Amino acid sequence: MHIDRVVYLPITEDTVRLANLKSGGLDLIERALATDIKDIRSDPKLRLATALGIGYWGLDVNVGNGERVKNPLGSSAKVRQALDAAIDREALNQVVFNGEFFPGNQWVSPENSYYQQAFPVPKRDLAKAKALLKEGGVTAPFDVDFMVPKGAEPQAVAEVIQAMAAEVGINMKIRVTEFATSLKQAEAGEYEAYLLAWSGRSDPDGNLYSFHKCKAPLNYPGSCNPEIDKLLDQSRIPSDTGQRKAIYEKLTKLILDNEAILYLYHPRVLIAHTTRLEGYRQLSDGLVRVVGLTLK
């Protein structure tokens, strides 16, 4: 049966969405939880469509956006590098997402052709983290205001990061905030660290330029480096992939050294639907396309 009408129903609670799908109240839900994958796959009336997303989750650090930069994390790249070294990305993926997502440390995933292999996902190193804190002239412990969007998965991620960072004396004080409010506060510089996702773009420029260019609209950390700006502009000129990769390699080193954004992982797009719905195919951009779908 061809579909004549599509009804979109906003349901914010993850458990309610899945319950409605199971009961037949819905035919498809987007953004299923990774922890629900086993349950969905075991249900003969449900199907799971997945794709590795083109976006990422990362931790923004306020390094130049207002008065809230006056703290150890915002003032020193060494301290930000210490926080990075304290995070075990693979453990984070296993604990929160049952290993279903993709640990990362750049604005594109390790499966992307523009991923810089010279800068692989780092292993957790507590000794290095403590040494970097010392190099940064910081005496631990110290507190960090950690703004986190409301939601089961972001809050779980934040709690894991909090536990890991505490082992080197970085006390991440989680402040759960409604998503729309958190964006306004981030833009205004009313935070010290902010857990944030980006849906991603097919070209790496869409994951990079507006986040690291001086005074760019999505540069919530307020980072500004003339050398990074120059390379960002240069990266937009050539159409040759090899030339662009060479520029991105230089950019990657500068951006990872500065750590205004700590890239953490790349989510999978998880779409669950009933077996009544046929013809659904998921692409990496995360969009739900209804053309060609039928109900039996």
Tell where the protein language model's regions lie, with residue ranges:
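Long beta-strand-rich cores associated with HINT superfamily self-processing modules
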Residues: 271-296
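Short, loop-centered acidic/histidine patches that primarily coordinate divalent metals
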Residues: 267
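Extracytoplasmic/periplasmic ligand-capture domains
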Residues: 1-96, 112-258, 293-296
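Active-site-proximal polar cores
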Residues: 264
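Mature extracytoplasmic/periplasmic domains
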Residues: 98-118, 270-275
